[in-house]
Every structure is written in C-alpha cells, then in structure tokens.
Amino acid sequence: MARLFGTDGVRGVANRDLTAELALALGSAAARRLSTAGHARRRVAVVGRDPRASGEMLEAAVIAGLTSEGVDALRVGVLPTPAVAYLTSAYDADFGVMISASHNPMPDNGIKIFGPGGHKLDDATEDRIAELVQQGPGERPVGAGIGRVVDAPDALDRYLRHVGKAVTTRLDALTVVVDCAHGAASAAAPLAYRAAGANVLTINADPNGLNINDGCGSTHMETLQAAVVSYGADLGLAHDGDADRCLAVDANGRVIDGDAIMVVLALAMRESGELASDTLVATVMSNLGLHLAMRDAGIEVRTTSVGDRYVLEELRAGSYSLGGEQSGHIVMPSMGTTGDGILTGLRLMSRMAQTRKSLAALAEPMHTLPQVLINVQVADKTTVAQAPSVQSAVAEAEAALGDTGRILLRPSGTEQVVRVMVEAADEDTARQLAVRVAESVSEQR
C-alpha cells in the first residue's frame, strides 16, 4: 500500500484525491498523535494556507478535525509555509498545519504538518498519523472539551519582524522586481523587502484563488526576466505558491538558480564566520558546477536525497548552517526550520548591498554545466532502476561522460515518473545521453 504522505506532506487534486473528508481525518489524527493531554494550557495548533480556492474548504475541514479532538485552532490565514513553521514555534503551539500544494497548479492542494518547534515530521510520525487516519476517531470530547477557533491578527507582523532580522545591511540602493506567483508571498514579500529599504516593484501579486502559479512564479521565470530588464532593476526575485522557494534574476535577465544562490550565500557566510564546519548541504540534483565552485573555495558539500526534508535532516544531524536545493529551497537553521523564500531574498540582497557588487558578479564562481532532465512516465517507479537494460544504458552513459559530467536516475516523490538527469560539458552530449537512458526507462512500462 502506498504511503499517504509523500516527500512534502499529503498532496493531490483537491476534492478528488485530497477531499474534505480526508482533511478532517488528517486533522483529527494529527491532533491525537501530536498534542499531549495534561497541559496546564489548552492544546493549540497553528493553521495557515495559500490563497488557492480549495484552501478555504480544506482549512475548514482540518479545523473541524482538530477541534473535534479538543485542540484549539489558531488560524493565521494566508501566509507563506515558512511563516506557519515559524509561528508554530513562536506561539508555542503543539504543532502546525499548512494547506498548500506549493508550486503545483491550482487544482492541486496539499496538507503538510509541522511538529513542535515548527520542524517537519519524520517518516515514523507521518506513518503513525496515517495509521490513525485509517483507524478513525475514538471517543471525542464534549462540552467545554471541544476545541475553539481563534484568529491571529498579529501573525503576519510577527513573521515580518522575524525575517527582518536577516537584514545585515540596508537595501536602500537596490531596486527589485518580485514575482509573487499570485500566492502566499503576495502580501508578505513586498512588505518584507520594503521594510528593509528596497525599492520594490511587484508582478503577479493579485491572488484570486484561481491564478496561483499560472504562468508565473519560480517555475515560470520568463516574465520576471523580461520585467527586470525592462525596468532596469538590480535584480528580480521569484517565489512559488507558498513562498518556501526563491529564485533570482540578475540585472541582465539571467536566471540565478538555487545552486548559484547557495554558492553566493555559502561564500558570504564563510566570510562572516557563520558557515558551520565550512560545509554546505545540497541534494543529488545540485549541478556539478556547485561542487566545483565549493571545492575551489575549500568548502565541503554534503549530499542528500532530493527533498528539503532530507536537507533539513542532514543540517540538524551535522549542526550545519546552510543547505538547499537547485529549485530554490534554501534553509538556514539559525533563522528557520524549513526553506524560506523571503528570508533567502533578504539575505541575497543584503550581500549585494554589503559588497556593492551586482548579483551577476557575486554568482560568477558558479559555472553551471548543461543539464538535461527528462521525466518518464512508468508503471512502477520503484523497480525501473534495477532493470538490466536500464542499468546497461546508465553504464554506457557514465563511460561516455567519464569525469566531465554525471547521470542520475531517481523516482519522483510526488508523481509516478522516473527522472533522468544528465550533466555534461555541452548540452548536445547531455541531451543525447539523457534521451538514450530515458528510452530504456520508457521500455519498462
């Protein structure tokens, strides 16, 4: 039986895969697993969401599940995912729930749960919650024991004060175009950047519940690239639907991805003495160019599986201070327990202001090798890599690349696909090898 929880919570098409009934059951199960009876105070869970239309329905269902188990729901409304994680700690809540499908299209939605302190749950805890969903509720409280719903009007201000601490140098000399993806960053990001002194121009910051991630945000950079050049801005920043990602665009309209952002921040943090053990944590999807840049700088790279939860686990295990993903999830444990796109944007602009260098100049140490990624639909993503014909195709590709590139096969954590990624000295070679391996994978259908 497939796990209920994927790499980033429970996701699916809202009202088909992720129904109100399932959301209620998840709220109830999380309340039973994560809240502890016998508190001197009432048990509390923070609940937030992104602005997609189905969020209102799922929020109501989750809150019904929580309150039915005697847990008060502290409703913070539309806020970034990292804000919900932070507020779970700041309000000393038992746990937090974020309703969002991040960068996914509008019809999708998801539920991710943060434990005490705003930390993501481990697999064992998620599996126990899934078991409780299957079991259904037990005896429920009545009367005064039923949970209450409380709104938190200061939630956004508390989060903005928190991320504002990341600003080491005022940003008054910088003009930034911000693509908010019609998502949870639409209110928070412009306020945070303006509070730090930046001249902020916004695009895609008018959420109506239906337009989230629609041709905009960190998965559609073209509009932002054009806007930065058109306005003559110093840089652009793109967030996704729940603002846990940040990608950038330099003044020339060139995309600065998560790998390049990590290089900039790692070098800055080592200079300031903040880079613990002179180590950066990245995933297997990070470009070989990142590894080469860090090698040249004398910085070690610790590699994890794909997913910011695995980056977080490695950061905590090694007490490291910076990690992230090529997609723009950047984690700084001293400031947060999960990827925070707005925090990343502030740190990046602070570095520009401090050094008085352009983003292009700061990102110069990162030389990205051409990378080709092909998603192949398969019947069983867990067994494809063991097929002899696939192993043979991979071995041939590795022999052709030698030490000038690399190949990676991995099953998606959220879809029934296998991702074939090849990096090489030139794009033609990368594409040819990726296509050959992808064809061998597709034959396993």
From Swiss-Prot:
<dbReference type="GO" id="GO:0008966">
    <property type="term" value="F:phosphoglucosamine mutase activity"/>
</dbReference>
<keyword id="KW-0479">Metal-binding</keyword>
<feature type="active site" description="Phosphoserine intermediate">
    <location>
        <position position="102"/>
    </location>
</feature>
<dbReference type="GO" id="GO:0006048">
    <property type="term" value="P:UDP-N-acetylglucosamine biosynthetic process"/>
</dbReference>
<feature type="binding site" description="via phosphate group">
    <location>
        <position position="102"/>
    </location>
    <ligand>
        <name>Mg(2+)</name>
    </ligand>
</feature>
<dbReference type="InterPro" id="IPR006352">
    <property type="entry name" value="GlmM_bact"/>
</dbReference>
<keyword id="KW-0413">Isomerase</keyword>
<feature type="binding site">
    <location>
        <position position="244"/>
    </location>
    <ligand>
        <name>Mg(2+)</name>
    </ligand>
</feature>
<dbReference type="InterPro" id="IPR005846">
    <property type="entry name" value="A-D-PHexomutase_a/b/a-III"/>
</dbReference>
<dbReference type="Pfam" id="PF02878">
    <property type="entry name" value="PGM_PMM_I"/>
</dbReference>
<comment type="similarity">
    <text>Belongs to the phosphohexose mutase family.</text>
</comment>
<dbReference type="InterPro" id="IPR005841">
    <property type="entry name" value="Alpha-D-phosphohexomutase_SF"/>
</dbReference>
<keyword id="KW-0597">Phosphoprotein</keyword>
<feature type="binding site">
    <location>
        <position position="242"/>
    </location>
    <ligand>
        <name>Mg(2+)</name>
    </ligand>
</feature>
<dbReference type="InterPro" id="IPR016055">
    <property type="entry name" value="A-D-PHexomutase_a/b/a-I/II/III"/>
</dbReference>
<dbReference type="Pfam" id="PF00408">
    <property type="entry name" value="PGM_PMM_IV"/>
</dbReference>
<feature type="modified residue" description="Phosphoserine">
    <location>
        <position position="102"/>
    </location>
</feature>
<dbReference type="InterPro" id="IPR005843">
    <property type="entry name" value="A-D-PHexomutase_C"/>
</dbReference>
<dbReference type="GO" id="GO:0004615">
    <property type="term" value="F:phosphomannomutase activity"/>
</dbReference>
<dbReference type="Pfam" id="PF02880">
    <property type="entry name" value="PGM_PMM_III"/>
</dbReference>
<dbReference type="GO" id="GO:0000287">
    <property type="term" value="F:magnesium ion binding"/>
</dbReference>
<dbReference type="InterPro" id="IPR005844">
    <property type="entry name" value="A-D-PHexomutase_a/b/a-I"/>
</dbReference>
<dbReference type="GO" id="GO:0005975">
    <property type="term" value="P:carbohydrate metabolic process"/>
</dbReference>
<feature type="binding site">
    <location>
        <position position="240"/>
    </location>
    <ligand>
        <name>Mg(2+)</name>
    </ligand>
</feature>
<dbReference type="InterPro" id="IPR005845">
    <property type="entry name" value="A-D-PHexomutase_a/b/a-II"/>
</dbReference>
<comment type="function">
    <text>Catalyzes the conversion of glucosamine-6-phosphate to glucosamine-1-phosphate.</text>
</comment>
<dbReference type="InterPro" id="IPR016066">
    <property type="entry name" value="A-D-PHexomutase_CS"/>
</dbReference>
<protein>
    <recommendedName>
        <fullName>Phosphoglucosamine mutase</fullName>
        <ecNumber>5.4.2.10</ecNumber>
    </recommendedName>
</protein>
<dbReference type="GO" id="GO:0005829">
    <property type="term" value="C:cytosol"/>
</dbReference>
<keyword id="KW-0460">Magnesium</keyword>
<dbReference type="InterPro" id="IPR036900">
    <property type="entry name" value="A-D-PHexomutase_C_sf"/>
</dbReference>
<dbReference type="InterPro" id="IPR050060">
    <property type="entry name" value="Phosphoglucosamine_mutase"/>
</dbReference>
<dbReference type="GO" id="GO:0009252">
    <property type="term" value="P:peptidoglycan biosynthetic process"/>
</dbReference>
<dbReference type="Pfam" id="PF02879">
    <property type="entry name" value="PGM_PMM_II"/>
</dbReference>
